[in-house]
């Protein structure tokens, strides 16, 4: 081995020992005839000192520059009093270097690593192999590795088998667009890259592998946001002969163990909340419980008012009127309220009514709002009491279709929590349960809220009679307002699966064409089973405090689903296209 230690492993216990380090020159300093090199590797930094007494080595140190790859041998010693650096793991020691070998020189990098500033993300991604040298980036990938090690260990100890499922499979309707791979040997046919291992892991349950896991690559050709990538990594879990409580207990234990091992944090039991309660109180099926703000229904107090903006929705069973109290918000300037009004407009809200509570003891005179004249004082007092309003607060109102009100005020709640620094703790894990089985579309058709293999809490006959009110056996784990993972008990009887397909408008012919292998499997003794999948990238993002999952993936794609480093996707030559039986209708334009 070329090295004896990593730079970040050096400490006072090695005083007097000879060590050999290999790494990159992070910084070079010449102080009064003594040369200092900060050497960097994946584990951290170490300071190496070269003095003129060893002329040949000193001359070599004088020639090196930033990012040269070097091998250095020297003796560990304590730094002089007052010269320690508490910000470095090796900050109390230094290495007196007496051998230096330049393993490779380096051109000046496209951006400085030791004084990292506002470098554009495209430049960072184009030179990702340079960007990943930065200690903060290396630390994120090290933590990611520790996380997957912890997860594997936990699942192994709990009897799970790591089984790989195919990457080349067939297209199935799972919500997003598939990435397609043309077949050379089957002209005109295409493989699809998996959006998840969902069907294969269910088939593994039918095959008798009752505890499966896989850290799986998944692919979705969808519009990208800060927490999306076209290829992403999933912690995929499936079990047989366990119910919801068992699966949630196992996977909650995995996450609690993960945070304890990796971050030293201990969580108590995760609270459970129904989908209905989450939407009613927080306007979201993934509420951030660090935020103390809550939505409160007030439609019952506004049914008789002459103000149609309120009385209309108050008397419509498909609508909702909710209030959101913001402590201390009465001092909010009009411009800020206008900005929040524009913000809720993104979610379809037509406006944002408000009441500033200046002095409740003065009755209506102590309230500042364009709407108070339209609401009887008795009703106003009930509303203000219900939301807990006190002097100095502001109360916002949403009145519209229930979905619009929940989404708009739910998003406003999150924004206010961050804008006004209202978060009460650092971590708030929870479970959301009892999701609706389906989402009803405007045309009366149904879409599966999770996926079409989720089991309902009723019989096939009850499901087909009342699909709009059916609840599923689904559960989501949420952390700080982010869905960490979602899962469910699956359908394990053929007649139930066919009933769900019928409600989703999937004909028998289409069922057979796209899911025939699954329906076949369900005929041959499929056990009760269920599972859950966590987004690993998202989990790493939360645990490292990164702003985007691109920060925690070694070689991510841009928001336009491209790799600027390798210039992927790229053109292929005509011969390759002919072999794949593909002809382009339009020739791509040169960029």
From Swiss-Prot:
Keywords: Aminoacyl-tRNA synthetase, ATP-binding, Cytoplasm, Ligase, Nucleotide-binding, Protein biosynthesis. The keyword Repressor does not apply. It catalyses: tRNA(Asx) + L-aspartate + ATP = L-aspartyl-tRNA(Asx) + AMP + diphosphate. It is an enzyme of class 6 (ligase). Disulfide bonds: none annotated. It is found in: Cytoplasm. One of its GO terms (cellular component) is cytoplasm. One of its GO terms (molecular function) is aspartate-tRNA ligase activity. Belongs to the class-II aminoacyl-tRNA synthetase family. Type 1 subfamily. Aspartyl-tRNA synthetase with relaxed tRNA specificity since it is able to aspartylate not only its cognate tRNA(Asp) but also tRNA(Asn). Reaction proceeds in two steps: L-aspartate is first activated by ATP to form Asp-AMP and then transferred to the acceptor end of tRNA(Asp/Asn). This is Aspartate--tRNA(Asp/Asn) ligase. It comes from Pseudomonas fluorescens (strain ATCC BAA-477 / NRRL B-23932 / Pf-5).
